[in-house]
A protein has these predicted regions:
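C-terminal outer-membrane/trafficking sorting elements
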Residues: 415-456
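Middle-to-C-terminal accessory/interaction subdomains
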Residues: 26-27, 37-39, 80, 84, ...
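A conserved helix-loop-beta module that forms one wall/lid of the active-site cleft
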Residues: 116-149
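Coil residues (strongly favoring Ser/Thr
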Residues: 54-56, 183, 285, 350
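Internal "kinase-insert"/substrate-recognition segments embedded within catalytic cores
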Residues: 92-98, 105-114, 134-139, 151-262
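Conserved NTP-binding catalytic cores of kinases and kinase-like/nucleotidyltransferase enzymes
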Residues: 20-125
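Bacterial N-terminal signal peptides
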Residues: 6-15
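Positively charged n-region of N-terminal signal peptides that target proteins for export
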Residues: 1-4
Length: 456
C-alpha cells in the first residue's frame, strides 16, 4: 500500500510539473544563455544566443536553431523586475538586427507585462495612440512567446529599446565627457524619475515638490556638461512657472508636449509625469536653439488604475511633476485641444478596433501564460482575454467620453501656409534668420519652420 501511495504521489507531482509548450499563435523567441546560466540581475550581461521562429505570422525569421545569433542578456525594469517572478529582459545583439519588421538595432527589450491586469493592452495601446498623434518616435512592440534555456516563459512583448539612434530618437549623439561648447547643446535624453541614482539632477519644483531627473545619455558627464544640463533643467522649470509665453515656447516644443500629454490623459496614467517620463533635446545649429521635447512614451503600467473623472494631475496617486502648471498655459491648452480634435475625429474609433484586434491575437498565449505564472508574486490573471479586453475597452470609452465633456470636439488646427514646406526648394522661397530663429520667406510672406504664417 505504501509503495502504491508513493507511486501515485510521484505521478501526480510529475503531471503538475509537466512543461507548458508555446501556443504556436505568435512568434517564438528562443533565448539561451551559455551553459544555461541564470539571468539574476539588471547590471551584468550574460552571454548567450537568440533566434526567433515567426511560425505563420508573416514576419521574417531571425537566426535559427542551428544558427542562432550571439547576444548579451540581462534583466531590466524597476518594479517590474523586483515585484514579480515573471521577469523582463534586455537583449543586446553583437550586431544590429532587423527584428520582427522593426528597423535594425542591437538593443531590444522583452516586456513581461506581469503588472498589466487589463489584457496586456496598456503599453501596446498607449504606443498606438502615440503613433496616431504623430510623436516623433514611438517604440515598436510585437507580442511573442518566450522560451528561455529550454523552458517556456509565457507571453512577452518584444519592444524597441528607447535610445538615441537614427532609427529611434533621431538626434545628434553626444559623447561622454564632452567639453565642446557646441556639441553639448544637444544629444540629451533625460527622464523625470522616481528612482535615485548618483548622477540625478535634483531640484524643488516651484510648488515645493522634490524632483529627480536622471540622465539616459550622455551617461558620464564632464563638469561642462553637468553645468549645461543643470542650467537647462532650471531654465525649463523657470519657464513653466514663469509668466512669459515667449520664453516657454523658446525652450519647450509645445506641440510635442501637447501630444505627449494627450496620450497620458486618454490612458489615464497618473504616474506619467512621475517616472519613466522622458525628454530629449537635439544640438543647436544655424543659430537656432533646439527645443526640449517630451517623449518618447514609455511604461503605461498604471493606466486606468485610478478610474476617476479627474485630470491625471488632479489629486494623483503619485506626484505629477510640471504638468499641473504646464496645463495652466493658454498656449498649451490650445495645442492640446488641437491634438484632441485630430484624435477625436480621426483616431478614437480606429484605435479602439486596433486594441480589440491586438487583444484577440493574445488569447491562446495568455491562457498558457496563466498556467505558468499563476500563484507567483503579484500575479495578474489575464487567462480570460475576452473579459480583460472588454474591461479595457470600457475604460477607454469612459475616458474618451469624459474628455469630450471637458473639451468637446476640441479646436480644429489652423491650416498651414499653402505651398510652404519646411525645407522648400522653390526658387521663390528663401531662409532667413531673425533674432536667432529660422524663418522661410515665400512669395513675400514669412513662415516659421512648421509652415505657419507669421508677421513680417
Amino acid at each position: 500500500m505504501k509503495k502504491y501511495i508513493v507511486f501515485l504521489w510521484v505521478c501526480l507531482l510529475s503531471a503538475g510539473m509537466q512543461a507548458v509548450n508555446p501556443s504556436g499563435t505568435l512568434p517564438i523567441v528562443y533565448m539561451t544563455t551559455n551553459s544555461g546560466q541564470a539571468i539574476t540581475d539588471k547590471e551584468n550581461y550574460v552571454p548567450g544566443t537568440v533566434y526567433i521562429d515567426p511560425l505563420s505570422t508573416g514576419y521574417a525569421a531571425l537566426g535559427s536553431s542551428s544558427a542562432p545569433l550571439t547576444a548579451q542578456l540581462k534583466g531590466r525594469g524597476n518594479w517590474t523586475w523586483s515585484g514579480f517572478d515573471k521577469k523582463p529582459y534586455k537583449i543586446k545583439f553583437d550586431a544590429k538586427q532587423k527584428v520582427l519588421g522593426m528597423p535594425k538595432n542591437k538593443h531590444w527589450v522583452l516586456i513581461a507585462g506581469a503588472d498589466d491586469w487589463l489584457g496586456y493592452l496598456k503599453n501596446p495601446v498607449g504606443f498606438m495612440i502615440s503613433k496616431a498623434l504623430g510623436l516623433r518616435w514611438t517604440p515598436g512592440i510585437v507580442p511573442v512567446e518566450l522560451v528561455l534555456n529550454g523552458n517556456y516563459q509565457g507571453l512577452y512583448f518584444l519592444t524597441e529599446h528607447v535610445r538615441v539612434d537614427k532609427n529611434r530618437v533621431n538626434i545628434q549623439e553626444q559623447e561622454d565627457l564632452c567639453t565642446n561648447a557646441d556639441s553639448i547643446t544637444g544629444g540629451w535624453m533625460v527622464e523625470i524619475d522616481n528612482y535615485w541614482s548618483e548622477n540625478n539632477i535634483e531640484f524643488n519644483e516651484n510648488n515645493g515638490q522634490h524632483v529627480m531627473v536622471s540622465l539616459d545619455v550622455p551617461e558620464v558627464l564632464s563638469n561642462v556638461q553637468r553645468d549645461y544640463i543643470v542650467h537647462q533643467i532650471e531654465a525649463l522649470n523657470n519657464a513653466i512657472y514663469g509668466n512669459s509665453s515667449a520664453t516657454l515656447e523658446q525652450i519647450l516644443d509645445i506641440e510635442e508636449a501637447a501630444k505627449f500629454y494627450l496620450v497620458q490623459e486618454i490612458m489615464e496614467d497618473c504616474e506619467s509625469y512621475h517616472g519613466s517620463c522622458k525628454l530629449y533635446k537635439d544640438r543647436d545649429s544655424l543659430g537656432m536653439v533646439d527645443k526640449w521635447k517630451f517623449g518618447p512614451v514609455w511604461d503605461f503600467g498604471n493606466a486606468y488604475d485610478r478610474h476617476a473623472e479627474r485630470w491625471i494631475y488632479d489629486g494623483p496617486t503619485w506626484p505629477q511633476y510640471w504638468i499641473g502648471q504646464l496645463a495652466t498655459w493658454p498656449v498649451f491648452q490650445k495645442a492640446v485641444k488641437e491634438q484632441w480634435w485630430i484624435y477625436y475625429h480621426q483616431y478614437k474609433d480606429t484605435i479602439k478596433q486596433q486594441a480589440i484586434d491586438f487583444a484577440n491575437q493574445l488569447t491562446e498565449a495568455a491562457k498558457l501564460d496563466a498556467q505558468v505564472w499563476e500563484g507567483t508574486s503579484n500575479f495578474r490573471n489575464n487567462s480570460n482575454m475576452a473579459d480583460r479586453r472588454d474591461d479595457f475597452i470600457d475604460r477607454y470609452n469612459w475616458r474618451i467620453n469624459w474628455l469630450y465633456k471637458q473639451w468637446g470636439e476640441g479646436i480644429q488646427p489652423e491650416e498651414k501656409g499653402e505651398g510652404v514646406e519646411t525645407n522648400p526648394t522653390n526658387i521663390e522661397s528663401r531662409k532667413i534668420l531673425r533674432n536667432g530663429q529660422l524663418y522661410i520667406m515665400y512669395k513675400g510672406q514669412m513662415y516659421n519652420v512648421q509652415g505657419r504664417r507669421v508677421e513680417n
